[in-house]
Design a protein with these regions (language model features):
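Extracytoplasmic small-molecule ligand-binding "clamshell" domains
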Residues: 19-100, 138
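Periplasmic-binding protein-like
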Residues: 28-29, 113-117, 191-228, 248-254
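Bilobed "Venus flytrap"/periplasmic-binding protein-like clamshell domains
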Residues: 46-59, 121-153, 159, 164, ...
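Extended ligand-binding regions for polar small-molecule ligands
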Residues: 54-63, 212-246
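Short helices/loops that flank or line small-molecule/ion binding pockets
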Residues: 59-64, 71, 76-89, 106, ...
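Ligand-binding clefts/hinges and TM-proximal coupling segments of bilobed small-molecule sensing domains
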Residues: 67, 147-159, 194-196, 230-254
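Acidic, polar ligand-binding/catalytic clefts
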Residues: 71-133, 142-145, 201-204
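A ligand-binding cleft/hinge motif common to bilobed small-molecule-binding domains
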Residues: 83, 94-103, 175-206
Length: 254
């Protein structure tokens, strides 16, 4: 009975996607080792798009024989398009859960979990919890800091990760608050440039990332169910871990 129900759900998902699924990628900041690319044109980005999360999501779509088109745009625009019944985006990933996002989209089971923290210069390793009003906490525009439980909001927000790293190295930021793994991933892949070494500090908190599907997409739930099935199967079989290990292995201890 459960097998027949699954076949029905998959069939419904196929029927709902007579047109190619519009898959959107936020293109202001790469997110290595999970999602990254090279080049500046849409074609260059599409041809070089890779990463551990990207691999799993696109594998899931291909397994269900779902045709898709890639669209690159700023992350804020991706979220705006997902709110629209006739928007340009049907699906994205590397999305953290927010209550307001859940009003217009469905979230998959967790695709991966990463650690939250902040970066300092080794010679200026201040404790964030001892920040004074004159100290500068830097962040990136559009990033979700809800789960960080910060003692205060970033006082200076930059337009990109590289800009935030630059400000930290110029000592115009005392701390750069961020997810840990994507920063080291970008550095190791040569996507972020450093003139001075930086040091990470864990906040003892983690953050889950998901596939995000537009609620108003016809038969969005069957599509979500098929994605969840693939993700859970990949995780239980060890395939997901093998994919993540292949792209980058980041140490979990300082």
């Amino acid at each position: 009975m459960r097998f027949m129900l699954l076949l029905m759900l998959v069939g419904m998902a196929h029927g709902a996607l007579a047109n190619p699924l519009r898959v959107c990628v936020g293109d202001v900041n790469v997110w290595p080792p999970f999602t990254y690319w090279q080049g500046s044109s849409a074609q260059e980005k599409a041809e070089s798009l890779t990463g551990s999360a990207t691999t799993l999501v696109l594998e899931a779509l291909k397994k269900q024989e779902i045709e898709y088109q890639l669209h690159f745009m700023p992350w804020a625009r991706v979220q705006h398009e997902l709110t629209q019944a006739t928007g340009r985006c049907d699906l994205t990933w590397d999305a953290s859960y927010r209550a307001e996002r859940a009003e217009y989209s469905y979230f998959s089971v967790p695709l991966y979990t990463i650690q939250l923290g902040y970066f300092t210069l080794p010679e200026n390793s201040k404790d964030l919890n001892l920040a004074t009003d004159s100290d500068v906490l830097c962040g990136v525009n559009g990033f979700n800091y809800q789960n960080f439980a910060l003692p205060r909001e970033p006082s200076l927000t930059l337009n990109s990760v590289q800009q935030a790293l630059n400000m930290l190295q110029k000592e115009r930021c005392d701390w750069f608050v961020s997810e840990i793994e994507p920063i080291y991933g970008g550095i190791m892949l040569g996507l972020y440039q450093l003139d001075r070494p930086i040091q990470h500090h864990f906040l003892g908190k983690t953050k889950e990332y998901h596939v995000q599907v537009r609620r108003s997409l016809p038969n969005a739930m069957p599509l979500l169910n098929s994605l969840n099935e693939y993700i859970l199967q990949a995780q239980s079989s060890g395939h997901a871990q093998a994919v993540f290990d292949r792209f980058l292995s980041i140490t979990q201890t300082e």
